[in-house]
A protein has these predicted regions:
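Positively charged n-region of N-terminal signal peptides that target proteins for export
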Residues: 1-4
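C-terminal segment of classical bacterial N-terminal signal peptides
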Residues: 12-21
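Primary mode marks residue(s) on the alpha4-beta5-alpha5 output face of response regulator receiver
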Residues: 25-53, 57-178, 186-290
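Beta-strand-rich interaction/scaffold domains
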Residues: 367-430, 434-435
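Flexible, small-residue-rich N-terminal segments that precede or flank a structured functional core
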Residues: 289-348, 444-446, 455-471
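A short beta-strand element within beta-rich, extracytoplasmic domains
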Residues: 340-342, 352-370, 464
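Extracellular/lumenal carbohydrate-interaction signature centered on repeated Trp-anchored short motifs
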Residues: 332-334, 346-359, 429-430
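Ser/Thr/Pro-rich, low-complexity mucin-like regions
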Residues: 428-456, 470
Length: 474
């Protein structure tokens, strides 16, 4: 059985079409997951009771069943989601069309969102967190459940639409939006019987008895139905808990107003921490750039030649880059190089579970041209991570390097986070038995100055291991 939650805020986003909302998110990330499997299981409401729950459609973790726990989701972490860091179990009741056909979601697109983070910052999801949304006994509109016809006028709480063919003319697309609560009580990880989470108010503030604000899970379930040309939403049915009669289970069905969703957190701990501390709380649109694992720079500084050749800049909050190869060349002109070191983030120990997922190493920096409005390329030159300290290194005692780059980054004068692919170089370092890598960042060779935020600034340079696989959104 499901517990009934009554809440007050609706913010709905579409999967596969434009987003509509009552309030724009400050920070946001998203994940797209294909349908995985159907089972009459529910690990939140009927744990360890296989076959006893209503029929559910599962997305995300491929192994989710009645016995799933936070531990098993990470141990058997194969996922249908495009972000390899997300092995969450997402599930919803199975749908039946008016003609009796059972259909499954084509995909879900889930937005992770935060509001008013300057005043009310979010915390990463705790390991083992479960969330519920909606009412499986519902018979009227719910403020946290919404419906959309792709050929219509956006999301509505009322089931009074008749969906026609979407703009492509190839199928009826019907979406269900499910908004999960975002204020946790800080104690109860399990949702069954605890009311462990409620919704923040319109300002993004959580109540005193549920003080821990989390990124809001805004799940959008898309059914792409090429076999029909019209759908009366009021006649759609969803599975209910079966009835036990004479020792046999009889399936039951309810109206579309019984729509609800279950969430069992399967993000890696690094991913949830990054989502909160390095994305949402910076009011960023991070899209799919939520890493499986990451490390923050363990050392960063810059070195400068000529009159500053013996000066150390280890405590600088802003690092500088300047490179001028004109006229007499770089050794005569002013030159400033940023020096940065990372521990290499760990890869999955169960990599065989991640069929289809491509993992790549990236560096994320907050930087920009501070000389003029020009756009240009900067370069990442490998150097040794050993034998230098950010608090003592200067131009005159800096580690050696060659002007042969492992990576480059095209950038302009906008100060923002940027990502650079260093996958090949980091994998070569791993193959050589290294656990750390270090880089000089060199300029565009025409004398312009670039600023890079250091680890002392709050916008810490990070090295990320990002896993991605293509998910079809027809």
């Amino acid at each position: 059985m499901k517990f009934v939650f009554c809440f007050s805020l609706l913010l709905a986003c579409s999967a596969g079409i434009s987003i509509t909302s009552a309030q724009a998110a400050d920070g946001q990330a998203n994940v797209v997951c294909n349908f995985s499997h159907m089972k009459p299981d529910d690990a939140i409401m009927m744990p360890d009771m296989p076959g006893m729950a209503m029929s559910h459609d599962f997305m995300g973790n491929r192994s989710t069943d009645a016995f799933s726990t936070a531990e098993t989701l990470l141990q058997r972490s194969g996922t249908t989601c495009n972000n390899g860091a997300d092995s969450t179990g997402y599930w919803i009741p199975t749908m039946k069309l008016p003609d009796g056909e059972i259909v499954h979601p084509t995909y879900i697109k889930t937005y992770y969102q935060a509001y008013n983070v300057g005043q009310y910052p979010v915390t990463g999801y705790p390991h083992g967190l479960q969330l519920l949304a909606g009412d499986h006994r519902g018979n009227s509109p719910n403020p946290h459940i919404s419906f959309l016809c792709a050929n219509g006028n956006g999301y509505t709480n009322k089931a009074n639409q008749i969906c026609g063919l979407r703009s492509k003319g190839d199928a009826v697309q019907f979406n269900i939006g499910i908004m999960f609560p975002d204020c946790w009580d800080g104690k109860n990880l399990k949702a069954r019987g605890t009311k462990n989470a409620v919704y923040s108010d319109n300002e993004g503030q959580c109540p005193a008895d549920h003080p821990v604000k989390l990124p809001k899970v805004n799940m959008n379930v898309a059914y792409v139905l090429p076999q029909i040309t019209s759908l009366d939403v009021s006649k759609v049915e969803l599975s209910l808990d079966p009835q036990l009669v004479d020792g046999e289970l009889t399936p039951l069905w309810g109206s579309i107003y019984t729509a609800h969703g279950d969430f069992m957190n399967g993000w890696t701990e690094d991913a949830t921490r990054f989502m909160a501390d390095h994305c949402m709380n910076f009011a960023m649109e991070c899209s799919t750039n939520i890493p499986y694992s990451f490390t923050e720079a363990v050392a960063d500084t810059y070195v400068s030649n000529q009159t500053e050749a013996d000066t150390n800049f280890g405590h600088a909050t802003t690092l500088l880059v300047q490179d001028d190869w004109r006229n007499s060349g770089r050794n005569i002109n002013k030159q400033i190089l940023t020096l940065i070191k990372f521990k290499i983030p760990p890869q999955p120990t169960n990599i065989e579970d991640y069929t289809g997922v491509s993992f790549k190493y990236k560096i994320r920096l907050y930087e920009g041209n501070i000389t003029d409005a020009k756009a240009f390329t900067i370069f990442f030159y490998p150097t040794t991570p050993d034998g230098w300290d950010e608090n003592t290194v200067t131009w005159n005692n800096k580690p050696s390097f060659k002007y042969s780059s492992d990576a480059s980054l095209y950038m302009n004068n906008t100060q923002q986070f940027r990502y650079v692919d260093v996958d090949s170089a980091v994998r070569a370092a791993l193959a050589a038995g290294k656990t750390e890598v270090a880089y000089y960042i060199g300029g565009e060779r025409n004398g312009r100055t670039i600023s890079v935020n250091s680890r002392e600034s709050g916008k810490t340079p990070t090295m990320m291991l990002v896993g991605y696989q293509k998910v079809v959104e027809p």
